[in-house]
Amino acid sequence: MRPYIVCHMMASVDGRIDCAMTEQIESGDEYYEALAELGCPSLLMGRVTMQLHYAAAEPFVAKEPAPIGRQAVHVARRAGGYLVAVDTHGSLCWPAGEFDGQPLLVITSEKCAAEYLDMLAGAGISWIAVGEERIDLPEA
């Protein structure tokens, strides 16, 4: 069975996703209760959200920026669910390879530096490089 994606997000009335704004909402745990009821085995978050909540403050800067230039996959750990980070160019550094009991899986484009992907593999983090210019999520 092909997996499907459920978009469970908070946004402002004007449609912007503003992480600073959502942290000021004092409405209880409705968002997280609804998320738990969905029963999704994996969670996918974008670069900005991951940077705010999980990644290290300093970005990754490749000494050798040569891109991987092809579709590739590295499975560091098989699991029933993952915390998935969408990081097109490979800029997030990770203090750990697991968060909230789920292993991390990073999805990048094929323009991502091979050095970044080597760093992830060395840290025991799974990754997928897919999409020439930008991430090809259906292919991932």
Question: Where do the protein language model's features map onto the residues?
Answer:
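N-terminal nucleotide/polyanion-binding subdomain common to many enzyme families
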Residues: 1-99
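Short, structured patches in soluble enzyme cores that scaffold and shape functional sites
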Residues: 9-11, 87, 108-110, 129-131
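Hydrophobic/aromatic beta-strand patches that form the interior of the parallel beta-sheet core
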Residues: 44, 84, 105-107, 128
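A short alpha->loop->secondary-structure connector
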Residues: 101-104, 124
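A glycine-rich beta-strand to alpha-helix segment
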Residues: 111-140
